[in-house]
Regions:
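ATP/NTP phosphate-donor binding region
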Residues: 1-92, 348
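Short Gly/Thr/Asp-enriched flexible loops that form oxyanion-binding sites at enzyme active sites
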Residues: 51-52, 82, 101-115, 148-149
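Glycine/serine-rich anion-binding loops at beta->alpha junctions
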Residues: 90-106, 140-146, 280-283
């Protein structure tokens, strides 16, 4: 196992109607003016924005609003937010939404607190942020875990590059308000895509090619089992509060570093491969991960079939054969069967993408930073490897 540091400064306020406390929570932050950042019109039409405004008015907190964040959040919206916040002298950022809104808020926070640096440089990782304006969250989509994480992902429309910032505790939200009822109105596809994203944040940390800690493995496996079980419930009962609550809390725990303790950080190849899909073709992140995972797993499992066999036995109750390869492959198939059971794609075709070999080559070229980097630690992947995985996923 590897040495590690575990730090979770985010205050979690969990449960029914907790978003109604937002005025009091922000007052405790001693902020003068808040940006309320949100995504689609649903935050307005549902009455959520009215409730937030009312709570802030009651607390005597000034605010401005900026909506229009889309999935795979855009750099142009980040720049718009930075300009607005400078003009309005905002000193706190409130994200009302899911991972895209939270990540957009974090990027705005970086841009405001580092005025002499182009914010995109933090995503190219050519510069490191020295500060970040504080961020708080009212979560409406359980998926990304960005409400407790120290990273964010932004898409630059120039070249359609989707890039993540380096992990940095500066951008971890000060607080996250988690009311499972706010996720009731999500479309089924978005709910289940979010469940895949939650699973993958733990899976990326689970599949490492080193000796891991038994306690971390047990936490990770329990979290994965919980997500699989409750995501199936939500296929039939979209307003099941208990299932929604389990999924929402799992989303936060899956990406706050807990399931990576002692693992050295994780593999993250599948995420890197999906970032090119999401940036280029604007697909839902979780669905893109589901479409790629089986091909990635079959390509790399032979680097440590025993680890994949452990996954198969402990997550899907597959009998352990003396042939670890056989058990490993059975586990990969079981995972794909699970994706199908929640109507998630297991190929690029099912994702709605029928890509040519040239288009796949271009994805691998971008993912490898023009053939200058490898990805993954379970098995290091160069550009040719990436291309083979994309091709196998067709």
């Amino acid at each position: 196992m590897r040495n590690f540091e575990y730090f979770t400064p985010t205050r979690v306020i969990f449960g029914k109607d907790t978003h109604l406390k937002i005025g009091t929570v922000l007052k405790e932050q001693n902020c003068r003016k808040v940006l309320i950042h949100y995504g689609s019109h649903s935050a307005v039409s549902s009455g959520l924005m009215d409730e937030i405004r009312s709570s802030l008015d009651e607390a005597g907190i000034s605010y401005v609003t900026l909506g229009g964040v889309v999935p795979n959040p855009r750099l142009s919206k980040v720049r718009e937010g930075i300009e607005l916040c400078r003009k309005e002298q905002v000193d706190f950022l409130l994200a009302v939404g899911g991972g895209s809104v939270i990540d957009s808020c974090k990027a705005i926070g970086y841009g405001l607190a580092n005025p002499d640096t182009d914010v995109w440089n933090f995503f190219l990782r050519t510069e490191t942020p020295k500060a970040c304006l504080p961020v708080g969250v009212i979560l409406t989509i359980a998926a990304s875990g960005s409400e407790m994480s120290g990273s964010c992902v932004i898409t630059n429309e120039e070249g359609w590059l989707k890039r993540s910032s380096a992990r940095n505790d500066l951008c971890r939200p000060r607080f996250a308000i988690l009311n499972p009822r706010l996720t009731y109105t999500l479309p089924q596809y978005q709910t289940e895509s979010g469940c895949v994203d939650i699973l993958m944040h733990t899976i990326e940390r689970y599949f490492v090619n080193i000796e891991t800690m038994e306690i971390t493995d047990s936490i990770s496996e329990s979290l994965m089992q919980t997500v699989i079980y409750n995501s199936r419930i939500l296929m039939k009962e979209t307003d099941n509060y208990t299932a929604r609550a389990e999924i929402m809390w799992a989303g936060s725990l899956s990406h706050n570093g807990l399931t990576g303790c002692g693992t050295g950080g994780g593999d993250w190849a599948c995420h890197q491969l999906e970032h090119e899909l999401g940036g280029t073709y604007d697909v839902a992140h979780g669905a893109g991960l589901a479409a790629l995972w089986g091909s990635w797993a079959r390509y790399v499992y032979d680097a440590n079939p025993e680890r994949f066999a452990q996954f198969a036995v402990n997550i899907f109750d597959i009998p352990c054969s003396t042939d670890f390869n056989k058990t490993a492959l059975a586990g990969i198939e079981a995972m794909e069967d699970y994706f199908r059971s929640i109507q998630m794609p297991t190929s690029l075709h099912e994702l709605g993408l029928d890509l040519t070999e040239k288009e796949i080559h271009d994805l691998a070229f971008k993912c490898s930073f023009e053939d200058t980097r490898t990805i993954g630690v379970f098995k290091q992947l160069n550009m040719k490897d990436m291309e083979k995985i994309y091709l196998a996923a067709r």
